A protein has these predicted regions:
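Short linear motifs at protein or domain termini
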Residues: 1-23, 29, 147-152
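Short, charge-rich amphipathic segments
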Residues: 1-11, 42, 65-68, 143
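Short solvent-exposed beta->alpha transition segments
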Residues: 78, 145-148
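Non-transmembrane, amphipathic alpha-helical segments
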Residues: 8-12, 35, 100
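Conserved amphipathic alpha-helical segments that form helical-bundle/coiled-coil interaction surfaces
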Residues: 19-97, 108-116, 126-140
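Residue-level signal for pocket-adjacent positions within structured domains
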Residues: 3, 89, 100
Length: 152
């Protein structure tokens, strides 16, 4: 349903990532409290997979979705999960080219590691900060790609 109401153009990419930052930060804050050990182990396995897929952007994007999905589920709020999925899906249209670049994938992996570490420490504030920083990095790399004429 969100896709029906939002049509993304360059001028509102910043609004999308502002919304994602708010949602992902709160989701991470809640997940730091609510995630169980199985979900944390799942995240750790996903990160291992991401290290192995850095040279395959399509595979990395799949594992990126699984990483975020596990955190959305771990937040314990099904509505936040659905909102996170919708905002993530909207961003993919603009993210595809940026996420082909090795330096972008490496930065995402570093961001994911920092977020995982905060979640593992059960530190809601650090988890929220890590999620928000990740969204800032995603936004920056997306806009860098846009300024190079490459949003697809």
């Amino acid at each position: 349903p969100i896709r029906f109401f939002l049509s993304l153009e360059k001028m509102n990419i910043s609004e999308l990532y502002d919304a994602r930052s708010l949602i992902e930060g709160d989701v991470a804050r809640r997940a730091a409290i609510n995630m169980d050990e199985i979900q944390l182990a799942t995240l750790d396995n996903i990160l291992t997979n991401q290290e192995e897929t850095l040279k395959d952007a399509d595979e990395f994007r799949l594992s990126d979705f699984k990483f975020h999905e596990t955190i959305w589920i771990g937040s314990g709020n099904s509505f936040l999960k659905r909102i996170g999925e919708s905002l993530n899906s909207l961003g993919l249209e603009f993210r595809r080219r940026a996420s082909e670049r090795p330096e972008v994938l490496n930065q995402s992996l570093r961001d994911h590691r920092a977020l995982f570490d905060a979640l593992s420490m059960r530190d809601p504030s650090a988890a929220a900060q890590a999620a928000e920083k990740h969204m800032q990095n995603v936004y920056r790399s997306t806009m860098d790609q846009s300024s190079e004429g490459g949003i697809s």
